[in-house]
Amino acid sequence: MLQQIRGPADLQHLSQAQLRELAAEIREFLIHKVAATGGHLGPNLGVVELTLALHRVFDSPHDPIIFDTGHQAYVHKMLTGRSQDFATLRKKGGLSGYPSRAESEHDWVESSHASAALSYADGLAKAFELTGHRNRHVVAVVGDGALTGGMCWEALNNIAASRRPVIIVVNDNGRSYAPTIGGVADHLATLRLQPAYEQALETGRDLVRAVPLVGGLWFRFLHSVKAGIKDSLSPQLLFTDLGLKYVGPVDGHDERAVEVALRSARRFGAPVIVHVVTRKGMGYPPAEADQAEQMHSTVPIDPATGQATKVAGPGWTATFSDALIGYAQKRRDIVAITAAMPGPTGLTAFGQRFPDRLFDVGIAEQHAMTSAAGLAMGGLHPVVAIYSTFLNRAFDQIMMDVALHKLPVTMVLDRAGITGSDGASHNGMWDLSMLGIVPGIRVAAPRDATRLREELGEALDVDDGPTALRFPKGDVGEDISALERRGGVDVLAAPADGLNHDVLLVAIGAFAPMALAVAKRLHNQGIGVTVIDPRWVLPVSDGVRELAVQHKLLVTLEDNGVNGGAGSAVSAALRRAEIDVPCRDVGLPQEFYEHASRSEVLADLGLTDQDVARRITGWVAALGTGVCASDAIPEHLD
């Protein structure tokens, strides 16, 4: 049946029996396709019936359907004509793992940062009103996890003040990655129990009204009592007191019930909350049994067992997790903060070992950072573990709440650099540029597991300002020993005997192996190269300046945007010191990159050892001749 669905119009004639059959087929399709490619399996298994109902009730794309975060949009993609492309999911040139405006007119928003859908919806509804399109509804699908983010409530405050037709579907599965926390989660949990309360009141009403003569009087009295009790106790007041109509809770796996609720909301013609209760991982036993994350995001798996088909090696995240626990065992002042992602950021084990020292603040990066400032003011040393890309959301708090007060807060930035298959909004290529303008901050980029442990310990010893460590996604390679340490930097390679000190190659973090491979290629061309790891990238250390004056050219190699990154910091430091050494930056052009594997993205950008060696050869030739001619660059430097 799924093969016959080319667009939402094909759903309109289906019977309830056919819809149930289609839902089962969609789940089977999801399990086998995502098992092959990896992706967000659990969230999509949980929204099958909800997405069917959305596309039967609303006229997409005339009525925009905006999925907050977007990782639960696979079913939406299938129902809008993209089922045949799922073999390419998250692969280079293939189907994006998130909504994509380039793929379909049904996809309005493609950023995968949470809690933004309601603001998009508010703006679209205003635009439709001002341009005379008053017959268009805007639908925002937001999870209960995203409702822990303050941006949702800023948007609700504005939406509620209007009569614009915005339908807010709360997909309540009790989780983001981990179980949803906080007061909003408690309110939603209570709302799930409301049907029994309402049913009991309705039964009592019928019995009282049946009493001869006085039944009606008693009914009116009890109704007023009920209203008073409900006004003081009913948790849907969280929404209705804002002026929002509330519908629900609705069983999110009963397509007909969801459809009835959505049609009611559509007729209302003003802002409505439709509360839909779903189960993440629905219909797939391995996901339902995964208590930690219900298979929120998976690598390729065996669909029969749910087990990964490839065993991963030691990872950066796991190395950080073990190191932090080791330091915390010795120091009771170390606490940790996560923004709803304890598992992905390596804090689950920390929380199990020190349950009173881990704070999950929900999807609230701004609050996380200022709460960390408060913890530091109280004499503790907080470690905020966060994906690099989500650090963007807390920049003002880093600057004004942490750095201004010179507070010892350590930020651990996972998934720094190119992450690959999740696309542009997950690449962590902005952090060095942002943090480079924060007064007093120290930023480290470890090259291997041993350096991660060392530099984390050094960060935890800082008591007069913020620190940050950044490392990429994936496996951590073998340790790289230093020849020596000079002025705080590790010298990893020196010019071979008989070669000049031509190039100082500054390798940032996990790009150290590439830098060593580049140096080997250049040595084979007779170019002398010194490779250093500055360890602490910001501020630029004296050792970098001391070594720079001994070389003819300085090149930085980094997995950050070249605008304002490590290369910019080094160049500025040399200028301030009046060191006249030519500098070149090799890093990420300041662009948004489509999804592909990390190695594919880097290769497309010319960030391979061969390509980098060719560029440096050209620069060295230009320094010798005064002209940087392309024919001076060998095609192959093997």
UniProtKB/Swiss-Prot annotation:
The lineage of its organism: Bacteria, Bacillati, Actinomycetota, Actinomycetes, Mycobacteriales. Its EC number is 2.2.1.7. The gene is dxs. Thiamine diphosphate binds at residues 71, 112-114, 145-146, 173, 284, 365. Belongs to the transketolase family. DXPS subfamily. One of its GO terms (molecular function) is thiamine pyrophosphate binding. Transmembrane segments: none annotated. Gene3D superfamilies: 3.40.50.920, 3.40.50.970. SMART domains: Transket_pyr. PANTHER family: 1-D-DEOXYXYLULOSE 5-PHOSPHATE SYNTHASE-RELATED, 1-DEOXY-D-XYLULOSE-5-PHOSPHATE SYNTHASE, CHLOROPLASTIC. Homodimer. InterPro entries: Dxylulose-5-P_synthase, THDP-binding, Transketo_C/PFOR_II, Transketolase-like_Pyr-bd, Transketolase_BS, Transketolase_C, Transketolase_CS. Binds 1 Mg(2+) ion per subunit. Binds 1 thiamine pyrophosphate per subunit. Pathway: Metabolic intermediate biosynthesis; 1-deoxy-D-xylulose 5-phosphate biosynthesis; 1-deoxy-D-xylulose 5-phosphate from D-glyceraldehyde 3-phosphate and pyruvate: step 1/1. It catalyses: D-glyceraldehyde 3-phosphate + pyruvate + H(+) = 1-deoxy-D-xylulose 5-phosphate + CO2. This is 1-deoxy-D-xylulose-5-phosphate synthase.
